[in-house]
């Protein structure tokens, strides 16, 4: 416990680090546009993921049904319409062929398709009569067309996933965007089953991959405001894709949520069912740097990590060895508690979300007298974010 108190005190002394980072939105209580506040519980509406469409300046925000009384699981915000700090969330305006049950993360690909994985069930038992259990499904909506029509849907079979509630992050791999969008793969992590579920859109097929590097290493301890301590132990969670090679393959970088080690493997080992899987351990990021989400920026060749317990966003340039001498911090704030999602949009802007809610199996966490939602969404230009850090290998060094 002493090390953790020391770590937190260090962060509070630092105050805010990240001169170029701007806070776009912050919520204590999420509200929904057009929905009577008395019909839902604001403490239960906790966003976990987002995607930003730079062309329309619209944010898509996922609010999973982990608790009762969540009116919409997929929502949107028009930045032009809502310049205020804590805008209400509007129901997703796209057209789905089935009701959306519970979504944790949206992702926009290079073809401007919005992908989601609907886990098909709620996290609480009393909600099953209202939200009838469905097969977990991968769904895509076309953002280039009016009303965002559904353009792909695939229900995942039981042999590839036993518990869809333990899905982590996912990455979308468009093999040749200039040649068309049909040849696409999704790589979905499962932090409880320690697997990656692969979806082949073109052939409407799926399979799972297992490896020891997907497993968690130790419990992660996190202290919420008020001093309440929680622990969790989760396997593979975050995944991001590197630059596309001439063969169409890319490096997939991944990490377990309860580990500080980073691995990579060619997507060629994922795209072919039964292929040999030989990942490379790149290195260890150092003590207390656990994260559940990461993203690669092709412009800077940097991977950014939204860390879980340090209340900071860190970076590592993939052109350098991975160790504590080649990583750095681009943002640190005592109010940035538990990073849940991070992405780079088509304009090379880094976006990162924290919601103050770790992945612990404790329904009473939101009923804790000290619990107060701290949902923050930040953005910064990727080049500006690494200026004068160890991640800026071509610019000014610190």
From Swiss-Prot:
Subcellular location: Secreted
Biased composition regions of type Basic and acidic residues, renumbered to the chain: 75-85
InterPro entries xref list: 6-blade_b-propeller_TolB-like, Royal_jelly/protein_yellow
SUPFAM superfamilies: 3-carboxy-cis,cis-mucoante lactonizing enzyme
GO CC annotation, single: extracellular region
Extent of the signal sequence: 1-18
Region (Disordered): 73-94
Function field: Probably modulates blood feeding of sand flies on vertebrate species by binding and sequestering different mediators involved in the host response. Binds biogenic amines. Binds serotonin with high affinity. Binds histamine with low affinity.
Name of this protein: Yellow-related salivary protein SP04
Organism: Phlebotomus argentipes
